């Protein structure tokens, strides 16, 4: 394992010059970043994104691709703060659509809005007709391990998205608690 120490004089220097190769697992402890490449020790069934997708949905879930291409694209924009400080706002490119053959990624509270983190999937209507759509509230519930319509309590749809973006993934918490329980039992 290699170790690197980065030293910056101020936040502006960090913002302008920070670059770091993060691997797929890591923590920050006492201001130090520890990152390693890990491989899951799991041989069971893996739920893929396509497993939670509903085949036929209302038209209101389909979106205009161009706006999302811009939002999910890379940016490097000079901005000025309220105090007059000039800085560079930058974001890297995100994939326009989510890969249905992989596990779904984390959902944010802004899921129901038009933003770069919104999950988009590609729907092939025919060979020449490919559309893009956002997830339905039920798909969001499934992605987090909740039952269908769990948030359908009469609240507005945007709040259903918010709830799922603010939720813990039930299956993940359950599996982690079982594993922690096993570790604790072995230590007794």
What are these regions (language model features)?
Residues 1-7:
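Domain-level detector for long C-terminal conserved domains
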Residues 9-188:
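C-terminal target-recognition/interaction regions appended to catalytic cores
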């Amino acid at each position: 394992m290699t170790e690197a120490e980065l030293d910056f004089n101020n936040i502006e220097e960090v913002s302008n010059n920070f670059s770091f190769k993060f691997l797929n697992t890591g923590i920050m402890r006492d201001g130090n970043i520890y990152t390693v490449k890990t491989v899951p020790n799991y041989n069971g069934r893996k739920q893929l994104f396509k497993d939670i997708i509903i085949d036929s949905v209302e038209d209101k879930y389909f979106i205009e691709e161009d706006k999302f291409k811009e939002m999910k694209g890379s940016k490097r924009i000079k901005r000025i703060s309220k105090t007059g400080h000039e800085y560079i706002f930058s974001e890297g490119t995100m994939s326009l659509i989510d890969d249905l053959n992989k596990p779904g990624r984390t959902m944010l509270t802004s899921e129901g809005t038009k933003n770069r983190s919104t999950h988009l999937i590609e729907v092939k209507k025919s060979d020449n007709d490919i559309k893009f759509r956002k997830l339905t509230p039920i798909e969001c519930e499934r992605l987090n391990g909740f039952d269908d319509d769990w948030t359908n309590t009469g609240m507005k749809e945007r709040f259903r998205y918010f709830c799922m973006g603010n939720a813990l993934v039930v299956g993940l918490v359950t599996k982690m608690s079982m594993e922690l329980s096993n570790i604790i039992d072995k230590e007794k």
